[in-house]
Structures are given as C-alpha cells and as structure tokens.
C-alpha cells in the first residue's frame, strides 16, 4: 500500500495511542518494529506504559515563560520532517498524538499571551496553526503512513428560544453523525477531510477483560471515513477488537483487492 493518513478518534482509554504506537513497537514483545518511527506527543498526551523508546518520541509542552514557543516548535519540527523527506530521509511511520490536545493547547497559550486585542484573534490563530499542521502532515510528501488521534465530540443540538423559536449554537444540518472528532472552530467540520481514513474507537467490557473496538464502517451514530466502503463486503469485518495497526492495514489491503479475488481468498488472518 502507498503511504496514507489515518485518524483514530474516541474517548480517553479507547486504545488510540495503543494502536498508533503498535506501528512502532510490538506491545507483546517490546520489539522495535519501526526504528525510524516517530511518536509526536502534544501537551499532556503521553503513555509511558506503552514502552516506546525515548529516541522515537518527540514531546511538545508549554513553557509558561514563552507560551507560543511550543506551538511554533510543532510547526518548525514538522517542516523539518518535510525537508528531510525531500532529501530521502523518510521516517518509517509518524504518529501524531493528537489533534484535540493541540486544539486545547492553542486556546491555553492564546489565553496566556493574546496575539491581538479583538475577540476573533484566537480563532484566526487556531485556524492558521491547524491549517499548517494538516497541510504538512501529508503522507504523499513525507513518504510514510501518518497516524493521528483526536478525542470524541458529540453533536450540538443548540438552545432554542421559546419566544422566537430560533435555535442557536447547533451544529449545521449536514452533521448527521452523533459522534465525530472533537475540535473547535473551523476544524470542527473539516478534520476528516485531511485523512484517507477516519475510525471511531471505544472500550467495551467482556468476560475476558476490556476490548478496544475500532469501527470500520458507518452505522449512523459515529462518523467513519472509509474510502473502500464500496468494496466492503463479507467476510470483511465491520469492526476490529484490540487490533494492531498492522492488522488494520491487512484488512484495508484486502478490501482494496478486486471483489472476485477477495471472495476466493477470504480475509487474511
């Protein structure tokens, strides 16, 4: 498969970081699968229990003395990856963790040190940074798979004025999923456009312990972006439980094969 962009979204503990880092390290053996794999941690996104080597981690945290330095640092670092890729120095995989935390960080930083004295300053700043990040995190340019995360947001129904009947604060009518990646401002409706795949994760209980379920096809409650939905026929699964990134790619690779060939072969185990 050519390098592609994957967005994984869900609440905390749904398994986003586990799947993202499984592209870098085997979580059962701690074997390093991607020596040049990179886990970019934004703000408070981190998990030392996943045993990813420090050499494969890049962190961006707020310095209260220079609040905007962490934001500009993210952009400069990503630009550096772009320059390196142009010279043939390509990462094995990039795991950007994650968009919602960056969104929160932008607001936090702007509150500490506003850039302009008007009410729209934060939103212009937010749009500028988010646009830059989504444009630079291009798998075709960087030459590797890019995995990103976001937390889960819920459809806003708004508040209706009893006197006028007017509803304010609601999501527009084209938002027809109850759950989707959690963002603010312009990016709230645009994040999935910058990914080839967008999958929803949730944690479920079972008699054998917690299951981290990744939904692969749309069912109405949660937003899914699946570019091969027109080829998604049995025995392809509607979801994967406690899967690794490699297992996800196997299913997607199988979905990309001609339908007649798939029926003969079945899904790879």
Regions found by a protein language model. Name each.
Residues 42, 98, 203:
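Residues immediately flanking
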Residues 48-50, 105, 157-158, 209:
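Generic domain-boundary/flexible-linker signal
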Residues 89, 142, 193:
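Structured loop/turn residues at beta-strand edges in well-structured enzyme cores
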């Amino acid at each position: 498969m050519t390098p592609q962009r994957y967005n994984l979204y869900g609440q905390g503990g749904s398994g986003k970081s586990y799947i993202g880092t499984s592209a870098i390290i085997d979580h059962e053996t701690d074997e390093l699968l991607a020596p040049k794999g990179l886990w970019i941690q934004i703000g408070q996104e981190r998990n030392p229990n996943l045993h990813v080597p420090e050499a494969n981690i890049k962190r961006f945290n707020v310095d209260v003395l220079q609040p905007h330095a962490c934001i500009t640092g993210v952009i400069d670092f990503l630009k550096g990856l772009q320059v390196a890729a142009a010279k043939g120095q390509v990462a094995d995989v990039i795991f950007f963790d994650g968009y919602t935390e960056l969104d929160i960080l932008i607001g936090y930083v702007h509150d500490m040190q506003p850039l302009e004295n008007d009410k729209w300053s934060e939103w212009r700043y937010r749009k500028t940074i988010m646009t830059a990040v989504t444009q630079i995190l291009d798998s075709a340019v960087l030459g590797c798979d890019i995995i990103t995360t976001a937390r889960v947001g819920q459809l806003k129904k708004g508040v209706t004025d009893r006197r006028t009947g007017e509803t304010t604060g609601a999501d527009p009518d084209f938002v027809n999923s109850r759950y989707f990646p959690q963002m603010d401002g312009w990016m709230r409706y645009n994040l999935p456009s910058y990914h080839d795949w967008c999958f929803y994760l949730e944690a479920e209980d079972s008699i054998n312990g917690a299951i981290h379920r990744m939904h692969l096809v749309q069912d109405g409650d949660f937003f899914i972006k699946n570019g091969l939905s027109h080829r998604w026929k049995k025995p392809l699964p509607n979801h994967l439980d406690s899967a690794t990134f490699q297992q996800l790619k196997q299913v997607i690779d199988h979905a990309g094969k001609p339908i007649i060939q798939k029926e003969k072969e079945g899904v790879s185990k």
